[in-house]
UniProtKB/Swiss-Prot annotation:
Protein name: Probable cytochrome P450 CYP36A1
Keywords: Heme, Iron, Membrane, Metal-binding, Monooxygenase, Oxidoreductase, Transmembrane, Transmembrane helix
InterPro entries per UniProt: Cyt_P450, Cyt_P450_CS, Cyt_P450_E_grp-I, Cyt_P450_sf, Cytochrome_P450_fam2
UniProt EC number: 1.14.-.-
Stored Pfam families: p450
CDD domains linked to this entry: CYP1_2-like
Molecular function as annotated in GO: heme binding; iron ion binding; oxidoreductase activity, acting on paired donors, with incorporation or reduction of molecular oxygen, reduced flavin or flavoprotein as one donor, and incorporation of one atom of oxygen
Gene Ontology biological process terms from the UniProt entry: organic acid metabolic process; xenobiotic metabolic process
Bilayer-crossing regions: 1-21, 60-80, 290-310
EC class (word): oxidoreductase
Residues annotated for heme binding in this entry: 440
Organism from which the protein derives: Caenorhabditis elegans
Length: 493
């Protein structure tokens, strides 16, 4: 009897502590967490962006989720600017997570690394990308060549139903492949497609709140099947990627000429390794393991997100046929059909730019942004004190569907980004590439690919639904948010 009373008392105390957990710790309000698991099962992975938007309506632009550690969600535009941008250094950390340690066995890469040499690695990558002309004229030529091949492939379909995804995998994947390895792959080679399949297997459960339970309770990995954590599938795909990159590195090392200017990221990194080894100065992480994981990061980031945006673009296009007519007229009037579109044409294509910005707004790829953590104590985060190491989600996606900024936010309307004179308005409230110190390294490249591939396909084809009705705008949400598979038809203009 006494034991039962003690159990009941413990449960009552725990529920009381959970009920007032945020207030007791001086954290922003939020839904009441459950003992041990927090709010994990209140934010299902396939609806996490929608649930966060509902919590925003209830608790405001900053609130706390326990996943299972207390995690501060910032989802108001002005709050994001004040904290993630203006105080970016304090919010630029990455927490140690079970999933990253499982995937790369240490603190490596560019996007999820958190150690003393992260800044040096990011600076080096930015410098090499600039010297290689990433996102500049040379890249434009590469995209133009790949786009011509894409047009030929679609031409060969002869008005048959097309699933754009495998075609886009080849051309988009080849752009980052050229910068990383120094060459492009042919249509009959499968390496890029194999990587694409594997990275999607890795990402399927990458940001799942259930996976974050493993940060607190690693032994839950043994309950993979009942919890649907997907660990065996994730590790198999990850191991295949690492093995393939190791083989590519070994092959690359046999042919590199250290006396020549680097023609790829791998060349540049290996050359830097050699220089630093000669000077006995490897403290900034210039190792083969770092090179492999950095290429892993850049390859995956420079591929699937761009493919998803382009798929969203054509999904919204066939669902809004009046937009296609206006884009065709604008292209014909300002570019014509005799030459390829170039980046300088943007200033003459305001409606096309507005259309793509509306795609970025409604077709956001990350349902929830990757975890950050505070590197220092933050004395005033919207009236709350955050200790160093506090987990933070900068949920800029919520701004995209905020009525305060975008009236009728669920409606696809490119005209919202045109002024009264029909001029395009670049709106920094639409932020598909993150913000602050952890913003996307390849934003310029991604925007270039989306613009040039989209405009080339619009310049050459009329796009039609495959059947009497347009495909529904349905999404599949895991670590990424993408349209469900759909087909369209293309006819030569």
């Amino acid at each position: 009897m006494l034991f039962a009373q003690l159990v009941i008392l413990v449960i009552i105390v725990m529920l009381f502590l959970c009920r007032f957990a945020n207030k007791l710790r001086g954290l922003p309000p939020g839904p009441t967490p459950w003992p041990f698991i927090g709010n994990t099962f209140q934010v299902p992975e396939d609806r996490i962006d929608l649930i966060i938007n509902e919590f925003k309506k209830k608790y405001g632009g900053i609130f706390t989720l326990w996943l299972p550690f207390p995690t501060i969600v910032i989802c108001d535009y002005d709050m994001l600017k004040r904290n993630i941008v203006k105080n970016g250094e304090s919010f630029s950390g990455r927490p140690d997570t079970f999933i990253m340690d499982m995937l790369v066995q240490g603190n490596y890469g560019l996007f999820f690394m958190e150690n003393n040499w992260w800044k040096a690695q990011r600076r080096f990558t930015t410098h090499i990308f600039r010297s290689l002309g990433v996102g500049q004229a040379g890249t434009q030529d590469t995209i133009a060549s790949l786009a011509s091949g894409l047009v030929e492939k679609i031409d060969g379909q002869k008005d048959k139903p097309i699933e754009l995804r495998p075609l886009l995998v080849h051309v988009v994947g080849n752009v980052i492949h050229k910068h990383l390895f120094g060459f492009t792959r042919e249509w009959n080679e499968t390496e890029i497609l194999d990587f694409h399949v594997a990275i999607n297997d890795v990402l399927e459960h990458f940001t799942s709140p259930k996976t974050q339970l493993l940060d607190a309770w690693p032994w839950l990995a043994y309950l993979d099947k009942p919890l649907s954590l997907g660990i065996p599938r994730t590790t198999r795909a990850n191991d295949a990627i690492i093995q393939n990159l190791e083989q590519a590195l070994a092959k690359h090392k046999t042919g590199i000429n250290y006396d020549e200017e680097p023609s790829s990221y791998m060349d540049a990194f290996l050359k830097e390794m050699k220089i630093r080894a000669a000077e006995n100065a490897l403290e900034d992480g210039f190792t083969e393991k770092q090179l492999i994981v950095a290429i892993y990061d850049l390859y995956s980031a420079g591929m699937e997100t761009i493919i998803i945006v382009l798929r969203f673009a054509f999904l919204y296009l066939v669902n809004n046929p009046e937009t296609q007519k206006r884009i065709h007229e604008e292209l014909d009037r300002n570019v014509g059909r005799e030459r390829q579109v170039v980046m300088d044409d943007q200033k003459h294509l305001p409606y096309t730019c507005a259309f793509l910005q509306e795609v970025y707004r409604l077709g956001y790829v990350l349902p929830v942004n990757f975890l950050r953590c505070t590197l220092t104590d933050v004395e005033d985060c919207e009236g709350y004190r955050l200790n160093a190491g506090t987990r933070v989600i900068a949920q800029f996606q919520s701004v995209h569907v905020d009525k305060k900024h975008f009236p009728d936010p669920e409606h696809f309307n490119p005209d919202r980004f045109l002024n009264s004179r029909g001029e395009y308005i670049r709106d920094d409230r639409v932020n598909p590439f993150s913000m602050g110190k952890r913003s996307c390294l390849g934003e310029n490249l991604a925007r270039m690919e989306v613009f040039l591939y989209f405009c080339t396909l619009m310049q050459n084809f009329e796009w039609h639904t495959d059947g009497p009705y347009a495909p529904p705008i349905d999404v599949i949400t895991s670590s990424l948010r993408a349209p469900k598979p759909f087909t369209v038809r293309a006819s030569r203009r």
